[in-house]
């Protein structure tokens, strides 16, 4: 082997040592994080957004960006005894849906996404179903996951409630 060919081999080896690890590494492009849809978690009757902490941790541990995970807190999470009659500290089905719609709009605006995934528990699932079926949600929701959602709503029966 001549001096020139040995020098060329060293250069080729050096270049390969620098270029190959970079060329072979798999780094997702920055746009990959925005390709994941934002998820909005909706709690149930009488709950809070804290219900979703461990679920959000699970998504984060699977590399879902934290800025695409949103647990919302409903201002008055309890359902009214009678949906048509105002009751202090409680919301109607319509008010619940309107609050969810406003939160979805905020998430869409803040993330630049065109659709969200909604995940609901109990009464939160009712709000999601109502938003998709009767609100403006059909075009803004790509997927809905409803867990423990009562099919006929949340209601109270005065004959069943304990008397004080």
Please give the residue ranges for each predicted region.
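Short, surface-exposed "cap/lid" segments of acyl-processing enzymes
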Residues: 33-71
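Serine-dependent carboxylesterase/thioesterase catalytic core
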Residues: 40-43, 72, 76-90, 94-164
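Bacterial Sec signal peptide processing site at the extreme N-terminus
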Residues: 24-36
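Short, flexible hinge/linker loops that cap or flank conserved catalytic cores
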Residues: 7, 31-34, 110
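Hydrophobic residues on the short alpha-helix immediately C-terminal to a glycine-rich phosphate/catalytic loop
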Residues: 17, 55, 130-132
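N-terminal secretory signal peptides
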Residues: 1-8, 12-23
């Amino acid at each position: 082997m001549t001096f020139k060919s040995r020098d060329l081999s060293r250069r080729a080896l050096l270049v390969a040592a620098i270029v190959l690890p970079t060329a072979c590494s798999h780094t997702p492009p920055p746009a990959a994080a925005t390709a994941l849809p934002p998820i909005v978690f909706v709690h149930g009757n009488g709950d809070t957004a804290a219900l979703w902490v461990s679920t959000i941790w699970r998504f984060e541990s699977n590399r879902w960006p934290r800025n695409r995970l949103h647990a919302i807190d409903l201002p008055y999470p309890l359902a009214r005894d009678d949906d048509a009659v105002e009751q202090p500290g409680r919301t109607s089905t319509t008010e619940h849906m309107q609050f969810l719609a406003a939160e979805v709009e905020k998430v869409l605006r803040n993330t630049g996404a065109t659709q969200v995934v909604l995940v609901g528990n109990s009464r939160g699932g009712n709000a999601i179903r109502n938003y998709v079926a009767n609100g403006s949600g059909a075009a803004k929701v790509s997927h809905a996951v409803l867990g423990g959602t009562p099919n006929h709503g949340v209601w109270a029966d005065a004959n069943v409630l304990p008397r004080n």
